[in-house]
From Swiss-Prot:
PANTHER family: PRE-MRNA CLEAVAGE COMPLEX 2 PROTEIN PCF11, PRE-MRNA CLEAVAGE COMPLEX II
One Pfam family linked to the record: PCF11_charged
Sequence ranges of Basic residues compositional bias: 475-486, 494-508
Organism, as annotated: Homo sapiens (Human)
Protein name: Pre-mRNA cleavage complex 2 protein Pcf11
Stretches the record annotates as Disordered: 167-186, 266-648, 707-732, 749-781, 1056-1081, 1127-1147, 1159-1187, 1289-1315, 1516-1555
Classification lineage: Eukaryota, Metazoa, Chordata, Craniata, Vertebrata
Gene: PCF11
Glycyl lysine isopeptide (Lys-Gly) (interchain with G-Cter in SUMO2) crosslink residues: 291, 328, 456, 654, 723, 1278, 1419, 1511, 1524, 1546
Amino acid sequence: MSEQTPAEAGAAGAREDACRDYQSSLEDLTFNSKPHINMLTILAEENLPFAKEIVSLIEAQTAKAPSSEKLPVMYLMDSIVKNVGREYLTAFTKNLVATFICVFEKVDENTRKSLFKLRSTWDEIFPLKKLYALDVRVNSLDPAWPIKPLPPNVNTSSIHVNPKFLNKSPEEPSTPGTVVSSPSISTPPIVPDIQKNLTQEQLIRQQLLAKQKQLLELQQKKLELELEQAKAQLAVSLSVQQETSNLGPGSAPSKLHVSQIPPMAVKAPHQVPVQSEKSRPGPSLQIQDLKGTNRDPRLNRISQHSHGKDQSHRKEFLMNTLNQSDTKTSKTIPSEKLNSSKQEKSKSGEKITKKELDQLDSKSKSKSKSPSPLKNKLSHTKDLKNQESESMRLSDMNKRDPRLKKHLQDKTDGKDDDVKEKRKTAEKKDKDEHMKSSEHRLAGSRNKIINGIVQKQDTITEESEKQGTKPGRSSTRKRSRSRSPKSRSPIIHSPKRRDRRSPKRRQRSMSPTSTPKAGKIRQSGAKQSHMEEFTPPSREDRNAKRSTKQDIRDPRRMKKTEEERPQETTNQHSTKSGTEPKENVENWQSSKSAKRWKSGWEENKSLQQVDEHSKPPHLRHRESWSSTKGILSPRAPKQQQHRLSVDANLQIPKELTLASKRELLQKTSERLASGEITQDDFLVVVHQIRQLFQYQEGVREEQRSPFNDRFPLKRPRYEDSDKPFVDSPASRFAGLDTNQRLTALAEDRPLFDGPSRPSVARDGPTKMIFEGPNKLSPRIDGPPTPASLRFDGSPGQMGGGGPLRFEGPQGQLGGGCPLRFEGPPGPVGTPLRFEGPIGQAGGGGFRFEGSPGLRFEGSPGGLRFEGPGGQPVGGLRFEGHRGQPVGGLRFEGPHGQPVGGLRFDNPRGQPVGGLRFEGGHGPSGAAIRFDGPHGQPGGGIRFEGPLLQQGVGMRFEGPHGQSVAGLRFEGQHNQLGGNLRFEGPHGQPGVGIRFEGPLVQQGGGMRFEGPSVPGGGLRIEGPLGQGGPRFEGCHALRFDGQPGQPSLLPRFDGLHGQPGPRFERTPGQPGPQRFDGPPGQQVQPRFDGVPQRFDGPQHQQASRFDIPLGLQGTRFDNHPSQRLESVSFNQTGPYNDPPGNAFNAPSQGLQFQRHEQIFDSPQGPNFNGPHGPGNQSFSNPLNRASGHYFDEKNLQSSQFGNFGNIPAPMTVGNIQASQQVLSGVAQPVAFGQGQQFLPVHPQNPGFVQNPSGALPKAYPDNHLSQVDVNELFSKLLKTGILKLSQTDSATTQVSEVTAQPPPEEEEDQNEDQDVPDLTNFTVEELKQRYDSVINRLYTGIQCYSCGMRFTTSQTDVYADHLDWHYRQNRTEKDVSRKVTHRRWYYSLTDWIEFEEIADLEERAKSQFFEKVHEEVVLKTQEAAKEKEFQSVPAGPAGAVESCEICQEQFEQYWDEEEEEWHLKNAIRVDGKIYHPSCYEDYQNTSSFDCTPSPSKTPVENPLNIMLNIVKNELQEPCDSPKVKEERIDTPPACTEESIATPSEIKTENDTVESV
């Protein structure tokens, strides 16, 4: 022993090392990594001597690993067993069952599916008995697990059957009545008999079987109970194929089948010998049995997986099997069919066992019992019918409460324990069923097959089959149910698609989250209760999961799910009202559907039906939008309807078409300012211009955008306000389909409610249109007027590049008006697009798109911030009804009480509506509603007047603090007005909306201010005093008037006192123009980042629309369309409050004080409300009592709307006024100075400045009334406005254009100049904030691929850049075809020089190769030429050929092409051969001869002369002097020639030069 000790010690050490190494590697196997598993397998093979230790390590790891990490370890075991085998196989086999069960118990459904697949590969590896034991054990945990029966030879070899037992067995199975029960009864005695007869050799095997049998016996007991349940379920499933509860009786039936199989399995071993002996004739029976077994849904499922047979195939097979099956099998089959969907899922494993069991039983029965299966079948069908009747009764109970049914059934059996087990198994089955959705589908189709049994189901199944007879249908149906009705109807469409897919896919589609036992659910509608049992959140979760999976498969589904979610939240309130109608519509759902949480889809549907009068559900819109399918949204019809009011054959004169709205409005306002036209005419013209351009825009957008309905412009802007907001398309805001439109209050106001819309200012050159129908969505409270807000960015925006477009759904009816903030369209990239009806019930989401591409888009339910990529940036989701903290973002009133989705309560805690983001209950609620103290209900964001809001500082922040959300809504906490501060994350470019009111502002001015980042683009921030929102685009425009422009809505600062919104652009924004200047004056555009206000010349008091503090209410009041109720606008009383008051006197709705009130001194108006309380700052006394304030409500819409809408006086006033007021400073915004502002009723959207005080007539409510283009055209011509293009254009246009664009250009230039050079990369400089740099990042044309921006002057570069992208994409695709390379390291210069236009390397290469190629070409060409002259055919052989000039003999070579000898480097001229160079020289010299004599050369040939001379010298030596003389003479001649020639040449050159 001592000798062995060292060896043992060494072995032990090696073992420890191997185990340690293996353990450490094994612990790293936390996910399914094939390389890692392969490595561990190889390691195991290398350590084969330590197989037992390694196996124990693996088993221990399997036991202790988290459930998510168990499967990889099982895969490792599988890999080792299959690849190494030997000792490992033996070692793993010992504890295979325990290991497998350990994993199976703790993992989820998806992992169980993987385990099933894994188990299915072991038949050839592990002993069949071990696998059988494993199957039985797993089946006890999950009845859906199929038990693969042992082959007959294994059974016979291991078990000797007592002949007595053989005699008994046929009898027992033959008992027809108790199909299941008899086996259960007979089995127990059978086991002891078998034991007695077994030889000891087989005792061990028998013990294993005995354990399995015990399990089977338990299952048999369950079967009895389940038979009863199955009967009940037949009726239920047939009558209603809806979700079943997890506990579901449905699961029980599946158990029945499972359990039935086990009993049969128990008998099977015993019967095997019988079959061998007596039933050798059994083949026919076996065939029948096989067919019968095929009926088994599980078997079908298997066949689906293995053979991919389609359902129809299976159905035929089933029919055949049914006809052929034994009575017993037929009975079981019907029940199975009834439960088939369930069974299929739960019993995929049992299919096999059932087959054999059925075969055995059928054989024994057929022998002992009546031989005619048909009779049995008939009797069986009768039984089934009876069962059906029972099941029908039960179905009612089930509908009420599936659990109740279950209990009753359980009671009948009196086996509570069994019931509990059943439930557990049912739950497990449910999981499995999810896995086996395909089976369920089959089951659904099978249901029809059964003789008459399925008739009840037929209605349901037919529906589902209409959707697709394929298996997928049932699953889809299930899903839809589980989801809630909404998905149902959509599902009807999607199922077909899904069904077409392969069964596997279908299964996959069935998300595990789907309600348990999807199959069952389908079959038994009663089980709907299960859904109820699920908590809504779980349902939602499931839906979300399902939707994600389904989305992949079915775009339609995806749309629905997306829509559903947002709607769910928004509609949850509405669900109450809409629930019943939906139920009626979808009566196939049980009444519980009402209780059940309704999907947004259903609710919307009901609402829409009610509101839209049977218009198609918005879902469709959304679907069309999301799927980009052209499904018309209900809006489309609306648009058509509205458009009908416009002549179909409407012809617009070229001048009008070519004219820019901005110019027309500007000119019109100028005419008004100069007194050439009256206020009324001005309003009418503006209104008509607006209509005309809206109509044109709508047409263009429709052509341009795939989802016309989604964009507010598409719809005629003028839509009846009456229509439910739902219809309004504007909901583009939500990004969701129109559903999300903000709904204006119920009234859909015409988009331009009142002249305000038309107000030139809006349309004015700046085109900053802040217009919203009064009622449209951004309704700042006006109860009537949702006032959509349309803030069109700088004139350039529509026509120009105005970065900001705040556009309410003017076109939207009913406040569907979405806010649409679009940043400058062009380069700026619309930094902010706030669009979509905000509160739209339907969809209500905001969509903020920041220039950067941030898209802040909320579904109705919530805001959804999407990052530039379109990826959801953000956390802010406002959804849910107010009570519900939807989306997790919950805005609470100061008290902290959850106001509801976003609900800002007053400080008092009353849910005043602060910011209430909720779908309006009615259409009206939808819009963002800024409710004043009135607290009018209205969904959407409700900015309530400061009063109510007091102090509620809201901070609308994306997920808190999350910049992404970008919205920061924070109100002044202290402000009474509760200024809202809506502010995007500052740093955040995109989001930008910062709605933040100045702290002090009374009236809670809102400050809507985009993130400081340029992206933010919009900052609406109302000075305190100025309750108005101040839209200050961060970088975006500042809507302070453009200098040249009439200040369309010049800065929307209300008069100072007035809270009117002030639109200011942040300084950085290049685009933004500030429309502060009086219209006539060019106010230098003020691009201030800060809301600097650019007041027109100081004198113009009005120019800045700061309304005197007194006006303060939110100065939204001014604009009817948008009304910020912060102050109660309704109250007409002037604001007497001291500045300090934060609009305590909401009562004074906006007061428009007389101009006199307005601070006449420019300074006064100058106040930006925001300063301090701002109000206090106002030089004018706050008391504005004198002014007429607009009635709040009247103004309501106008408040915002009025920016654009401000009644002409307002808007116009503002704008016009800006023109007028600006021009007539004293005039309060467009209102006559002395004139009072009359409250504008929502009907009169515009404030009319009526000296008499009478309200000027508002634009006709018939907003869609035909635009009398000819009348408008004639008016424009008459007033000279249209001549602008010719005459006025020279003056006004040119001046305006020069005033505006040039400033923009200057701005761009200035900004460019302001951009600091940061290339030295010093930390201190980089830490500083450079607005110009940020602005630069968000200005210019943006590349759709990479987001790079190019200035308008770089269009060529942009084109090159796009070409570069194309090349890059091509090279990426071609990478596989060619070898590519790059340098390992790039130098700084590479980075700096690199530009996404052309790869410098590529460019250099291409140039290089081109040059090389050119050189090669030239050389080849030259060579070719040379060859042409070089080769000259040689003379006759032997002839000596030499150059005529140099007399050098030519070299000869063989020209293979011509196959003859050639003289190399020779040319033949006139029959003589020369060297090319010699001949060239000769030619050159001869060209100098002035008058070369052709005959002279040949005669005087130098060679001949030389020869002659030589000869003469030889003959006459004494003549040599003569020869010399001749030689001497010749040179002089040459010299003379050469001298003469140059002179000639010079002459020629001179001539040329002179020429």
